[in-house]
Regions:
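Short acidic-hydrophobic, aromatic-tinged amphipathic segments that line or gate anion-handling sites
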Residues: 99-115
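The feature marks cytosolic C-terminal regulatory regions of anion transporters and related permeases
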Residues: 1-99, 117-120
Length: 120
């Protein structure tokens, strides 16, 4: 969206990174879509932008954990951007924040892009 100052089209994404944005709540009915994200060998960082995810249930968290494991096996660091309050609370309760590493959970897309640059 050209009116969005945080549009990824206006950002410089490092060559080693790719960005996926998830929109809407992640519940069991839509959560498996996370596993549809293709992992490409040319990237060593995948930024999952979650600014529009207002809620996350246990099933979605399970799929997110599976996706994290797939990334790990391919040597890709998963970085989360703009995780809202309820999803963050669910992640903390399940220990996902510790699993992924708190340094890989960023408040803003700019922070996530800077984290990707650190991981070149």
């Amino acid at each position: 969206d050209e009116n969005d100052p945080d549009s990824i089209d206006l950002k410089q994404v490092p060559n080693n990174a790719t960005v996926y944005e998830i929109s809407g709540p992640l519940f069991f009915g839509a959560a498996d879509k996370i596993l549809d994200i293709k992992l490409k060998e040319k990237y060593n960082v995948l930024i999952l932008r979650m600014r529009s995810v207002t809620a996350l249930d246990a099933t979605a968290l399970h799929f997110l954990e599976q996706f994290y494991e797939r990334c790990q096996k391919k040597g890709i660091t998963l970085v989360l951007s703009h995780v809202n309050e309820q999803p963050m609370n669910a992640m903390k309760k399940a220990g996902f924040d510790t699993l992924i590493g708190e340094e890989n959970i960023c408040l803003h897309i700019d922070d996530a892009l800077n984290r990707a640059k650190e991981l070149v």
